[in-house]
Design a protein with these regions (language model features):
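Extracellular glycan-modifying ectodomains
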Residues: 2, 26-479
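Bacterial N-terminal signal peptides
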Residues: 10-21
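N-terminal secretory signal peptides that target proteins for export/translocation
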Residues: 1-7
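Intrinsic disorder/low-complexity segments
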Residues: 7-10, 344
Length: 479
């Protein structure tokens, strides 16, 4: 389309009609207008200074790097060369795998390649030379190998790195993949899933994906640059996809005759509806997928919400696909304490070692005390706590656990604002370092803010879940 016609299409319909009446040719009705935004700007000095990334959220972007066009990168996350966790992180990941395995659930880990690995060709030469791509790729592949040795099914996504494709894998100014990136990832993941025992027994049907519209992305990296530099970047538009069963479009039956899906997807906002990752998985696997991921869920949000659901407790999947990025630390003890508790539904249906209920008032509230009816043996290494608020919208638990020797643990659990909560917080008592033999004395909970309604809550202590394992494993760095 020539420049004259582009100008014509950008005019008001009245002006365009008048010009057309004067003999100016119209563009073909089937041909959509094209738009091109010039690159916005260069980063200001403030964006290069890590001290300016002050909040916890801002620190996820430390520090921005200008690349070609409107591309931005983050030095700590996108251009990382290390992919690893602590010995405690490996131990917990192994325990989690074994617990799922004991319940007949096979876990597939989708460990995203970084934007630096995939799109280093967008960097300016000076930054590209500083980024050790070979080291990053080697360490990324080594991490995939460590997941695999722990027993996880791990798609090798390294063929996606350093790619030269017509459609961007990642957005220029955002950490999320585009629908095209999700599509290319899903194709590789599906090939791994097909090798998982039990996949052959899962009901199959054909799916097809098609472009269903356009999405505009105001990038998180672009937004951060705007906060630091006062700049404003153009919205990046991208095709959006919908996946439907072949021959069943619009029938209103999400899962057709296949019943409840036996494959579930948990993960970050990358697995959200906008990018159609679950849809592409269905297309390439030929099987239904229950997608429980939601925006803002992070590493654990959708996993915890799913584990506590009736869907999981009554109908656990044969295959659970867990998608996350190297951004997240894998040694966050509080996350595993919750997962291991919820895997067998916390204290639900189990005898209570100690229990109580009360109405919380503002400030500190004593809820459980070991000794009111005789001292009980409540060692951390063999017990868990299940707390339920009547108000299901409660998303934050602040508690202090006291022990017989005067020691205490301050515990704060925050659920994502975007999650569908049930007011429940179940977790194992702490057992890392030297905590396993601590004897629980009391549980205190912070009540609601002053001026708000009192909150009813109940708490139960019970024996923690015991998951059978074929052998005792010690997972550590360098597996």
């Amino acid at each position: 389309m020539n420049a004259h016609l582009i100008k014509l299409l950008s005019l008001s319909s009245l002006t365009a009609a008048l010009m057309a009446a004067a003999g100016v040719a119209r563009a073909d009705d089937s041909q959509a207008p094209t738009f091109k935004a010039e690159p916005c700007c260069s980063l200001c000095p403030a964006a290069h200074d890590a001290k300016n990334y002050t909040t916890r959220y801002q620190q996820n972007f430390t520090t921005l790097v200008q690349a070609q066009g409107d591309w931005l990168f983050r030095t700590q996350e996108d251009l990382r060369t290390e992919f690893d966790t602590t010995p405690a992180g490996y131990r917990r990941m192994k325990e989690l795998h074994d617990a799922f395995k004991s319940k007949g659930v096979e876990l597939v880990v989708v460990y995203q390649p970084t934007r630096g690995l995939v799109d280093r060709n967008k960097l300016f030469p000076a930054e590209r030379d500083k980024f050790d791509y070979d080291k990053a790729l080697k360490n990324y592949q080594a991490m995939l190998g460590r997941f695999s040795k722990m027993g996880y099914w791990v798609p090798d996504l390294s063929p996606l790195t350093n790619e030269q494709q017509a459609h961007d894998f990642y957005f220029r100014g955002d950490q999320h993949w585009t629908p095209y990136g999700a599509q290319r990832t899903a194709k590789i993941v599906a090939e791994t899933v097909k090798k998982v025992p039990g996949y052959s027994d899962i009901p199959k049907r054909e799916f097809e994906s098609h472009i269903s519209g356009r999405m505009g992305k105001t990038g998180t990296l672009h937004n951060m640059a705007g906060q630091l530099c006062g700049t404003s970047y153009a919205i990046q538009y991208m095709d959006q996809f919908t996946t439907e069963p072949k021959g069943e479009a619009g029938d209103g039956d999400l899962f057709g005759d296949s019943g409840n899906p036996e494959i579930t997807l948990v993960g970050t906002s990358h697995s959200g509806k906008n990018y159609n990752f679950a849809g592409f998985l269905q297309e390439y696997m030929g099987a239904d997928v229950l997608n429980v991921a939601f925006p803002g869920g992070g590493l654990e949000g959708s996993m915890l919400q799913y584990l506590g659901s009736e869907d999981f407790q009554k109908r656990p999947p044969k295959i659970l696909i867990w998608e996350f990025s190297p951004l997240y630390r894998l040694d966050q003890e509080t996350i595993y304490r919750q997962m291991m508790s919820l895997l067998d539904n916390g204290c639900e249906g189990k005898p209570a070692v100690m229990s109580a209920s009360t109405t919380l008032k503002p400030g500190t509230n004593e809820l459980l005390v070991n000794g009111k009816n005789g001292i009980k043996d409540i060692r951390n290494g063999s017990n868990q706590i299940d707390i339920k608020f009547d108000d299901t919208s409660v998303k934050v638990l602040q508690a202090r656990l006291w022990y017989m020797n005067g020691r205490h643990e301050d515990l704060k659990i925050e659920k994502p604002e975007t999650s569908d909560t049930d007011g429940r917080f179940a977790f194992e008592l702490r057992e890392d370092e030297d905590w396993a033999n601590q004897q629980l004395l009391a549980l205190e909970i912070q009540g609601p803010e002053a001026g708000t309604a009192p909150q009813k809550v109940e708490a139960k202590v019970c024996k923690r879940n015991v998951f059978p394992s074929a052998a005792t494993h010690t997972a550590q760095a360098g597996l």
